UniProtKB/Swiss-Prot annotation:
Positions of disulphide bridges: 10-82, 82-89
Sequence similarity: Belongs to the low molecular weight phosphotyrosine protein phosphatase family. Thioredoxin-coupled ArsC subfamily.
Subcellular location: Cytoplasm
InterPro entries in alphabetical order: Arsenate_reductase_ArsC (IPR014064), Ptyr_pPase (IPR023485), Ptyr_pPase_sf (IPR036196)
Gene: arsC
Catalytic reactions of this protein: arsenate + [thioredoxin]-dithiol + H(+) = arsenite + [thioredoxin]-disulfide + H2O
A GO BP annotation: response to arsenic-containing substance
Catalytic residues (UniProt): 10, 82, 89
GO cellular component terms, semicolon-separated: cytoplasm
Main function: Catalyzes the reduction of arsenate [As(V)] to arsenite [As(III)].
Main location: cytoplasm
Gene Ontology terms for molecular function: arsenate reductase (thioredoxin) activity; protein tyrosine phosphatase activity
Classification of source organism: Bacteria, Bacillati, Bacillota, Bacilli, Bacillales
E.C. designation(s): 1.20.4.4
The protein's name: Arsenate reductase
C-alpha cells in the first residue's frame, strides 16, 4: 500500500503547522508522509520547539517552508490550521481533500497557550486517525 500524504498549512509555518507536523509523524506513523508549510515563512518559533520537546517530540531540525505546489498536488489531505491559510490556500486539484482545523495562534502569547494549542493539535490528529 502506498503511503498517503497529509500537508499542514498555516500562515507562517512557525508554530501550529510545525507542531502538527511533529504530532503527525508521531501519531500517524509509517502510513503517512507528513509535511507542513506556510503562506509565508516566519522561522520555527523556539517556543513551539520547546512545547514539543516537553512531550518528547523533537522538531528542532524543522525548517519554515513556503507551500510547495508539487507536495500540495500530491497530497491526499491538506489541513489548514488558521483562517488566513484557509482563505489563501492555492486551488487544489479535485483528488486532494481539504479540511480546516481552526486553531488559535500561540505566537506572542503566554507559555500555557503553546501547551494548550499543542495539546489541541494532538487531539485533532488522534481523532483524525480514528476516522
Amino acid at each position: 500500500m502506498d503511503k498517503k500524504t497529509i500537508y499542514f498549512i498555516c500562515t507562517g509555518n512557525s508554530c501550529r503547522s510545525q507542531m502538527a507536523e511533529g504530532w503527525g509523524r508521531e501519531i500517524l506513523g509509517e502510513d503517512w508522509n507528513v509535511y507542513s508549510a506556510g503562506i509565508e515563512t516566519h522561522g520555527v518559533n523556539p517556543k513551539a520547539i520547546e512545547a514539543m520537546k516537553e512531550v518528547d517530540i523533537d522538531i528542532s531540525n524543522h525548517t519554515s517552508d513556503l507551500i510547495d505546489n508539487h507536495i500540495l498536488k500530491q497530497s491526499d489531505l491538506v489541513v489548514t490550521l488558521c483562517s488566513d491559510a484557509d482563505d489563501n490556500c492555492p486551488i487544489l486539484p479535485p483528488n486532494v481533500k481539504k479540511e480546516h482545523w481552526g486553531l488559535e495562534d500561540p505566537a506572542g502569547k503566554e507559555w500555557s497557550e503553546f501547551q494548550r494549542v499543542r495539546d489541541e493539535i494532538k487531539l485533532a490528529i488522534e481523532n483524525f486517525k480514528l476516522r
